[in-house]
């Protein structure tokens, strides 16, 4: 007689084994009708699952995060079903859930087209409208192999052969279509109400470039049409804000196949990077860091001692320079330990804080490279703190203050904090791990921020806090990190003289705020749609004439602004003023100044801000004062546009 405990603490008893669906019906129609799955002791199951023992149960509906996962998983199967109906010769492979959607990979004799995508989506709607029952089937290994061989699904046969023999095999059938899957799935296809196929891509079978190239169809699925429309709007807005597109409009950078994953910075783009560097240099000095610089090429033996060569060998660039093997620096931590090791250090010298604009190179697979977001060559705002165990909490606390200040100055106010604790495989005693984890938790608590814990997600050498930013489109970007390291200092022979005269290895705290300058700039460009805060804008003011009569006054105005440290340019081209205004608006110049005969006569300026349609007449002195004030405050003219409403004007 199973006893079932529900989330509200109530208990239901049944005289015989009962399905999840039957439990939902016993609670009420309002819960049974939208039931998608059940969660039994933290394990998701189908609503057809039979409960034959005492359990805790939560009915999953479209309102639950797990419900969206079930919907998207089922939508992937609906996609495969539709493709097989329309293109019987297509072979199915895998179709997992991904962030905000799903995909399915197919092998087919020709490339799918956008027109095919429309037909497939229409077929999916037809199959959903048919409200087909979705049934779970348990298969023996021989049954599964026989079934999928008969169907001509060689990729499924390969998957089955790789599944451990002791594992139960399950498949899901809807109508005439059956697919290998662990589940769970929605009970009927009619519960899939809001989905959209979004794009086509190529993908190697099992992610191995030595295997066949497959065709990947991406889609998204949501609980209802309103949520789907909101997501599609965000997707459209994200495409407009793509930093690679903005880079062309703003003349920031480009890439070339001769140097994949490395940036060719144009003057405008490099100006932004330099402003970011100077700001980070200022903030690190403010918080007591000393700036250092370490070599790009370091003998592989150092990386072997630190453990990086063993753990990240495939991701590291190396150069054989006889008789030695050199590594192109992938990170700065071992090099910073070498600086610490020069001379005797006492507990009185700690904490020591070293900061570097660390130029790093990593051998990222070519298929993962993506604009500024994923590079092979990049610069980190890298820093390492050498301290005692008792200093961990205070150092992490100060770092969190520093990080929040930086994010606020760049215009980000929503920061997500996650504490990752000890994994199964780790170095260091449980006592030291407990002390470090408690120190990180206490640092977060003292700041009064909300945070989540990620059990077992820490690095093998110590716990860490990850800091992520939520942008105006709701996307999450992991940027900052602070990691406690018990391993590398000891491996590299670092020690200090403790108060009792003994030698002890220091704790090393790895920390970064931006992550990398390049990626952070990519995030910032997309967050602001290229409308950077004034202090970062590569060109802050463009001064334009209407006719040649104003050329001298334009030149004087630009010279005066430049003498005050304003990045001002003139535009004296013989073009219509409307053309010039539009061109510089597309380039996201924060302030445009138009000078005609009246402005020359009155010794004034006609100023138009990027976000404003109207212009203001102002003196040069007052304009310069306002510019300097805005730059010093590092403020935006207005908050980022809401993702709920379209952004007006040119994009």
Swiss-Prot record:
Gene Ontology terms: cellular component: cytosol
Protein family (similarity comment): Belongs to the class-II aminoacyl-tRNA synthetase family.
Organism: Coxiella burnetii (strain RSA 493 / Nine Mile phase I)
Signal sequence segment: none
Co-factor binding details: Binds 1 zinc ion per subunit.
UniProt subunit comment: Homodimer.
Upper taxonomic lineage: Bacteria, Pseudomonadati, Pseudomonadota, Gammaproteobacteria, Legionellales
SUPFAM superfamilies, sorted: Class II aaRS ABD-related (SSF52954), Class II aaRS and biotin synthetases (SSF55681), TGS-like (SSF81271), ThrRS/AlaRS common domain (SSF55186)
Places the protein is found: Cytoplasm
Region annotated Disordered, chain positions: 631-651
InterPro entries documented for this protein: aa-tRNA-synt_IIb, aa-tRNA-synth_II, aa-tRNA-synth_II/BPL/LPL, Anticodon-bd, Anticodon-bd_dom_sf, Beta-grasp_dom_sf, TGS, TGS-like
UniProtKB keywords: Aminoacyl-tRNA synthetase, ATP-binding, Cytoplasm, Ligase, Metal-binding, Nucleotide-binding, Protein biosynthesis, RNA-binding, tRNA-binding, Zinc
GO biological process terms on file: threonyl-tRNA aminoacylation
HAMAP family referenced in this protein's UniProt entry, alphabetically: Thr_tRNA_synth
Superkingdom per UniProt: Bacteria
Protein name (Swiss-Prot/TrEMBL): Threonine--tRNA ligase
Summary of the function given for this chain in its UniProt record: Catalyzes the attachment of threonine to tRNA(Thr) in a two-step reaction: L-threonine is first activated by ATP to form Thr-AMP and then transferred to the acceptor end of tRNA(Thr). Also edits incorrectly charged L-seryl-tRNA(Thr).
PANTHER family (UniProt xref): THREONINE--TRNA LIGASE, CHLOROPLASTIC_MITOCHONDRIAL 2 (PTHR11451:SF44), THREONINE-TRNA LIGASE (PTHR11451)
Listed cofactors: Zn(2+)
Entry EC number(s): 6.1.1.3
Coiled-coil segments on the chain, per record: none
Binding site for Zn(2+): 333, 384, 510
